[in-house]
């Protein structure tokens, strides 16, 4: 076995036998462990004439004008200029024809053998220069193309070498690094894990602490691959990051594509962007339908490309007698996230048994305690359970969720019974008069079995019950789940049929279901068949489990028992079993008080013939708009959208996200002027922990429902730098590294410090399940899991703390939170940490204490983090040094910029360059006269380069980019609200939705005597008395004035979470806009280009 090393000559890579000790003493480096000086003179090839030669040709010798005369000189200069122009015309030909094979021809054209690297997967050469991008061209390509193996050029300083680990042969360049060894004359390439961390390295005199990655700051180390000089890069073809992104996308379908192909028509065609207002539901469907298809196509392509070979399987038998396969997948660079219930195809490809294939669904996903995945097979007939090796895993793509979204969009457009007229027009952005539902309000708003409500929660419940459309905003720890459950309780008690409650995720559904079950209502949890075997706290409420316990259908129970024991039924029994099961499902659903499901599950055929008057969608900002339409089109006449302020929807397809699919329905309605009701009292955080989030994200409106004394943990002995403030920022100087996937980051120094802090917390009395470690990067999460298990000083079981991403911690809490920031670089920015929503989530998860571990120098360049660091420094909790002797850091930061809001100076800037602001031309969010598109860096996508870093310069340099849905934004200026009453300006009268030939379908409706069915032509009415805007009999005015000091409110000002406006120029206009009256004359009638009235909503 030989090791790659620098031999006596610095011109070649020498392979040395480890036994030849006489060669190991050669000193080839001038400085200790410093290989950055190892560079060679570039083998520069002239590109055309040099500037000096051209100058000489144009000007001629000094005496040219005297000897040849003026005319001859001019003629000669003209001829040379013509030749020069001809050379410019041929510039593109130079890049395509005259470049050698090893040139970075796809990008810039640089072809110095010392500067280029060969991608073994794509079979293309790329240089190590940055050009106009934040990383080198080779690293840009490796990340975007998801490649990992490279070869150096044969004429380069190290010869033709495939970079690989000396110990295990790993060729993933994102894992590879080097260790100086044996008297500094040899460098050994080793992978980060596990080889570089093995203790056996000390036996051969290799110091693992000196391990450094081959790629730093998104460039290969200069001693390994030369970085082209600035002059060379200026002479090369200039290619932008945007062109690189488009070209890489094009290569997925056409590997031979060139930059010239980007100019062809149709290559970069963008879908139609979402609108703020829609003329009708047909336009709505025509815009969102293609975006849903884009997302579906991307998701399908992503899943079908995830095949993994050479998988080792561990077989087991479940309690239900079904086979379970356990296996671990290699670390992938995919955006795809495996979820419980996903389908996987497992194949045996070996020679020891017949070929076999089985389908199963995921019942266990990787977590903080291990990376093992478990699937439960539908049938295990023929499965080679005795053989552990040679398996292949395929991800099964199912179009169900996308099909249901498309179906919901179509139903919303063509079926008049799908939603009330009022909600229909409100969702489309039409100008309609606000209405109030006249209902019997409860004398006591607190629901049975739930905690008492505070003033803002009572106000929220009271207001929601009287409105057909409401938005609820719940900052962290303010009890939004309890408030939502209370609202559902009172809606169900009104006797208007079951209430449908949905959320984007199963976790959110389960949390809310658990609360409402305590009230004693009849609750049914509807879930996918693939999730029926997955345990949750509310499994007993699931429809399939309730059917199993129905005493009224003994025949069904017998058939179910027989099927569980034998695995299958005869044809006749199976037919009878399905019929009985459908009857039981229908009976349970129709007798339920509340039905719970995910937004996509609302399109389940079992709900197809039911309609729901009251629908609540929780955490609606986590769902795209088409997902929300699924529940809404089931007959919504009263719609409540709940929102956790730090949430966001995830759209994988970049094109769809840029077109606005990532914008939620909640956000668009806020932009349209529907004011959310905000809860104000938080019960989670120590007051010291809530101060910064309250002031920055919630305009100081959060009130503390707990005292500092309530948040002193008994039996916990931990020395905080400031005892009355259980928080600190631990200064760490480590450098970030690209993770093995190439699309994420890790920071080994931070990981070591996080382990030390965790150990101190455990020794101080905290339990593992009371500690949460948050990091924005999957690379750091995975590295921390392994580091804690193998390098922790305590028993491994004590390190079973939850380590997860910011997204995974949404809506949850821990006693103590440790935040690992990861980012530490000179050129790349701070990536995910730019997103204030993620910072808000991270800072608001803890009850008793928060510890941030990061590099202040890198973070302080971003305005929001600069504010945070200055805040911590002022409070003397910015510390450094050993944990047992922390001292205040002396680091200085620039003075934080003043936070300014152009409409409402009382609040901070709400500028975030995203779809929702760009939709309002001329508003505070529009930074151009043309309503230009926002910066791509703020679209919520999972683009790989976006994960690694964003451009350092953007329009938000003067403001902190707080997202729209983080704060309660000012209402759009009335001058925009009233521009000819909506999108039909200048078009005359609009056609209403009535009479548009919808399809007929049998539907079930709730009447006082119970469920009945009718066709859409004889659909019963709303059943609730409706009054126009004005004072209700309860004394609550629906149209509150814009200023809390005005006398129209009957509740105390502190109980009203609506924000005030200080802009006098908008006061009178807003009051007028909020008090317009009209007469309702028809179902969905329009008049003078706007909606004038609705008799049924």
From Swiss-Prot:
Q: Which organism is it from?
A: Takifugu rubripes (Japanese pufferfish)
A Pfam family this protein belongs to? Answer: UPF1_Zn_bind
Taxonomic classification, please? Eukaryota, Metazoa, Chordata, Craniata, Vertebrata
| Record's catalysed reaction(s) | ATP + H2O = ADP + phosphate + H(+)
Q: Where does Zn(2+) 3 bind?
A: 165, 168, 191, 195
Give every Upf1 CH-rich domain span: 96-254
Q: What does this protein do?
A: RNA-dependent helicase required for nonsense-mediated decay (NMD) of aberrant mRNAs containing premature stop codons and modulates the expression level of normal mRNAs. The formation of an rent1-rent2-rent3 surveillance complex is believed to activate NMD.
InterPro entries in the record: DNA2/NAM7-like, DNA2/NAM7-like_C, DNA2/NAM7_AAA_11, P-loop_NTPase, SF1_C_Upf1, UPF1_1B_dom, UPF1_CH/ZBD
Protein name per the record: Putative regulator of nonsense transcripts 1
| Positions of Zn(2+) 2 binding | 119, 122, 141, 147
Q: What class of enzyme is it?
A: hydrolase
EC number in record: 3.6.4.12, 3.6.4.13
Q: Which PROSITE patterns match?
A: UPF1_CH_RICH (PS51997)
UniProt region (C3H), positions on chain: 104-137
Offer a single GO CC term for the protein: P-body
| Family per similarity comment | Belongs to the DNA2/NAM7 helicase family.
Q: Which CDD domains match?
A: 1B_UPF1-like, DEXXQc_UPF1, SF1_C_Upf1, ZBD_UPF1-like
Where along the chain is composition biased (Low complexity)?
42-53
List where in the cell it is found.
Cytoplasm; Cytoplasm, P-body
User: Which Gene Ontology molecular function entries are recorded, alphabetically?
Assistant: ATP binding; ATP hydrolysis activity; RNA binding; RNA helicase activity; zinc ion binding
């Amino acid at each position: 076995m030989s090791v790659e090393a620098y031999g006596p000559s610095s011109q070649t890579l020498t392979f040395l036998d480890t036994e030849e000790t006489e060669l190991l003493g050669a000193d080839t480096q001038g400085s200790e462990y410093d290989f950055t000086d190892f560079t060679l003179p570039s083998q520069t090839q002239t590109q055309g004439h040099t500037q000096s030669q051209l100058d000489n040709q144009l000007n001629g010798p000094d005496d040219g004008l005297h000897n040849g005369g003026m005319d001859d000189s001019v003629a000669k200069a003209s001829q040379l200029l013509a030749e020069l122009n001809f050379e410019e015309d041929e510039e593109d030909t130079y890049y395509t024809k005259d470049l050698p094979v090893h040139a970075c021809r796809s990008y810039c054209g640089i072809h110095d053998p010392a500067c280029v690297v060969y991608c073994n997967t794509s079979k293309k050469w790329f240089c190590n220069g940055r050009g106009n991008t934040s990383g080198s061209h080779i690293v840009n390509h490796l990340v975007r193309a998801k490649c990992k193996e490279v070869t150096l050029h044969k004429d380069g300083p190290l010869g033709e070498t495939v970079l690989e680990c000396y110990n295990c042969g790993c060729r993933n360049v994102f894992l590879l690094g080097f260790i100086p060894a044996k008297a500094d004359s040899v460098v050994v390439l080793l992978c980060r894990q596990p080889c570089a961390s093995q203790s056996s390295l000390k036996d051969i005199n290799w110091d693992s602490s000196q391990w450094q990655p081959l790629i730093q700051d998104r460039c290969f180390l200069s001693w390994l691959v030369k970085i082209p000089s600035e002059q060379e890069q200026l002479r090369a073809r200039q290619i932008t990051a945007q062109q690189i992104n488009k070209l890489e996308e094009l290569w997925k379908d056409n590997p031979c594509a060139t930059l010239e192909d980007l100019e062809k028509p149709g290559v970069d065609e963008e879908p139609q962007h979402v609108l703020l207002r829609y003329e009708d539901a047909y336009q709505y469907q025509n815009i969102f339908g293609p975006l849903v298809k884009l997302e579906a196509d991307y998701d399908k392509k992503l899943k079908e490309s995830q095949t993994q070979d050479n998988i080792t399987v561990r077989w087991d038998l479940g309690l239900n007698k079904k086979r379970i396969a356990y296996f671990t997948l290699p670390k992938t660079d995919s955006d795809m996230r495996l979820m419980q219930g996903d389908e996987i195809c497992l194949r045996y490809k070996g020679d020891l048994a017949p070929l076999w294939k089985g389908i199963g669904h995921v019942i266990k996903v990787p977590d903080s305690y291990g990376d093992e995945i478990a699937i439960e097979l539908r049938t295990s007939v023929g499965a080679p359970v005795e053989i552990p090796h040679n398996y292949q895993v395929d991800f099964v793509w199912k179009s169900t969720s996308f099909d249901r979204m498309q179906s919901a969009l179509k139903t919303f457009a063509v079926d008049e019974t799908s939603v009330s007229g009022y909600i229909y027009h409100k969702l489309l952005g039409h100008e309609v008069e606000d209405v109030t539902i006249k209902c019997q309000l409860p004398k006591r708003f607190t629901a049975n079995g739930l905690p008492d409500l505070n003033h803002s929660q009572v106000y929220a419940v009271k207001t929601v019950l009287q409105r057909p459309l409401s938005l609820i905003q719940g900052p962290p720890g303010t009890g939004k789940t309890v408030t939502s459950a209370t609202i559902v309780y009172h809606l169900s008690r009104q006797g208007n049929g079951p209430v449908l409650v949905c959320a984007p995720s199963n976790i959110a559904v389960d949390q809310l279901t658990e609360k409402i079950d305590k009230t004693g209502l009849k609750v049914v949890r509807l879930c996918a068949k693939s999730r029926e075997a997955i345990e949750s706290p509310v499994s007993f409420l699931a429809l399939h489990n309730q059917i199993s316990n129905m005493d009224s259908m003994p025949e069904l129970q017998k058939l179910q028992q027989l099927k569980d024991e034998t695995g299958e039924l005869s044809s006749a029994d199976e037919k009878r079993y399905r019929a009985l099961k459908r009857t039981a499902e229908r009976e349970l659903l129709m007798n339920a008080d509340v039905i719970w499901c995910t937004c996509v599950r609302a399109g389940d055929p079992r709900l197809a013939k039911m309609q729901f008057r009251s629908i609540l969608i929780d955490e609606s900002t986590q769902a795209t708009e088409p997902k929300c339409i699924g529940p809404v089109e089931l007959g919504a006449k009263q719609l409540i959208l709940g929102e956790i302020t730090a949430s966001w929807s995830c759209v994988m397809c970049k094109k769809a996200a840029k077109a606005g699919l990532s914008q939620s329905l909640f956000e668009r309605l806020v932009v349209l002027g529907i004011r959310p009701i905000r809860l104000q009292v938080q019960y989670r955080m120590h007051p010291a922990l809530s101060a910064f989030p309250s002031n920055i994200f919630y305009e100081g409106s959060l009130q503390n429902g707990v005292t500092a004394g309530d948040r002193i943990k008994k039996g916990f002995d931990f020395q905080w730098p400031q005892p009355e403030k259980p928080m600190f920022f631990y200064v760490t100087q480590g450098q970030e590294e690209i993770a093995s996937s190439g699309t994420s980051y890790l920071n080994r120094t931070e990981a070591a410090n996080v382990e030390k802090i965790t150990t101190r917390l455990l020794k101080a009395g905290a339990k593992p399940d009371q500690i949460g470690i948050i990091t924005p990067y999957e690379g750091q999460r995975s590295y921390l899991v392994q580091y804690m298990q193998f390098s922790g000083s305590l028993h491994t079981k004590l390190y079973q703390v939850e380590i997860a991403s910011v997204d995974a911690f949404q809506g949850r809490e821990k006693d103590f939170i440790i935040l690992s920031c990861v980012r530490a670089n000179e050129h790349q920015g701070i990536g995910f940490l730019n997103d204030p929503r993620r910072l808000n989530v991270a800072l608001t998860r803890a009850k008793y204490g928060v510890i941030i571990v990061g590099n202040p120098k890198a973070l302080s360049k971003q305005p929001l983090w600069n504010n945070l660091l200055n805040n911590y420094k002022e409070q003397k909790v910015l510390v450094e040094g050993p944990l047992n002797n922390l001292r205040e850091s002396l680091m200085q930061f620039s003075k934080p910029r003043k936070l300014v809001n152009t409409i409402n100076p009382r609040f901070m800037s709400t500028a975030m360059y995203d779809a929702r602001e760009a939709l309002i031309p001329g508003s505070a969010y529009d930074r151009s006269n043309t309503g230009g598109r926002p910066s791509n860096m703020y679209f919520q996508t999972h683009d790989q380069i976006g994960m690694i870093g964003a451009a350092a310069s953007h329009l938000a340099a003067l403001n902190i980019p707080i997202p729209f849905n983080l704060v309660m934004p000012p209402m759009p200026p009335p001058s925009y609200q009233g521009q000819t009453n909506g999108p039909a300006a200048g078009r005359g009268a609009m056609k209403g939705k009535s009479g548009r030939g919808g399809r007929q379908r049998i539907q079930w409706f709730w009447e006082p005597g119970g469920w009945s069915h009718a066709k859409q032509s004889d659909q019963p009415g709303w059943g609730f008395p409706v009054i126009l805007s004005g004072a209700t009999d309860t004394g609550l005015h629906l149209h509150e004035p814009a200023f809390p000091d005005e006398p129209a409110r009957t509740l105390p000002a502190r109980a009203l979470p609506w924000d005030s406006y200080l802009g006098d120029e908008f006061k009178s206009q807003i009051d007028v806009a909020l008090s317009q009256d009209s007469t309702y004359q028809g179902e969905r009638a329009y008049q003078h280009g706007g909606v004038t009235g609705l008799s049924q909503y």
